UniProtKB/Swiss-Prot annotation:
It is an enzyme of class 5 (isomerase). NCBIfam families: 1-(5-phosphoribosyl)-5-[(5-phosphoribosylamino)methylideneamino]imidazole-4-carboxamide isomerase. Disulfide bonds: none annotated. The active site is at residues 9, 131. Its EC number is 5.3.1.16. PANTHER family: 1-(5-PHOSPHORIBOSYL)-5-[(5-PHOSPHORIBOSYLAMINO)METHYLIDENEAMINO] IMIDAZOLE-4-CARBOXAMIDE ISOMERASE. InterPro entries: Aldolase_TIM (IPR013785), His_biosynth (IPR006062), HisA_bact_arch (IPR006063), Isoase_HisA-like (IPR044524), Isoase_HisA-like_bact (IPR023016), RibuloseP-bd_barrel (IPR011060). One of its GO terms (biological process) is L-tryptophan biosynthetic process. It is found in: Cytoplasm. It comes from the Bacteria. It comes from Campylobacter jejuni subsp. jejuni serotype O:23/36 (strain 81-176). This is 1-(5-phosphoribosyl)-5-[(5-phosphoribosylamino)methylideneamino] imidazole-4-carboxamide isomerase.
Amino acid sequence: MTQIIPALDLIDGEVVRLVKGDYEQKKVYKYNPLEKFKEYEKAGAKELHLVDLTGAKDPSKRQLALIEKLAKEVSVNLQVGGGIRSKEEVKALLDCGVKRVVIGSMAIKNATLCLEILKEFGSEAIVLALDTILKEDYVVAVNAWQEASDKKLMEVLDFYSNKGLKHILCTDISKDGTMQGVNVRLYKLIHEIFPNICIQASGGVASLKDLENLKGICSGVIVGKALLDGVFSIEEGIRCLAN
């Protein structure tokens, strides 16, 4: 069954939203992250997603103490991403009680290290974040979306699916933080070619209709802005995906 996965992006402990990954286009929400996650959990969320934007910019400033507190205080699975660049960072997050670690640019820039991480920590502990943009074909973007690589999305998926990859988080960059609706075509395409990969869809979720369109295609739908802005509630999202 497709799950709704509520997401929080944090900069220096504050809940924020960026538009298309741009730190200059930042909206700060006056929410306590722990209280917000507990609210989401109480409403029925089974998984939570956290992006450490401080750590993404500077790994030496990763918000580990806060992440550990959040992982300990909520009883559902927490997955964390944000510029993970090393095996040590993956281990530190898993040691904090994080269930899954999201790794992105490394998968394109250092496949050897990425494969080592998959092997060492297991495919259930790792989610590959493939941020994609449509050129002539879907290509993967790297470095917090600032540049498009020459790697085609389907080729990257083919490579890693043959190495035991199970979970991906795929974001259509053109949609993220825009509330313009999700790119259903993209997720259908991935699901048809790689039926054994669990897809988490991210970027642009603006309505319950978006959730409905992804039902049965994706294992999870990451929702940030729509929940923070009160477009729909967790309960409504769960009901929509259950029907």
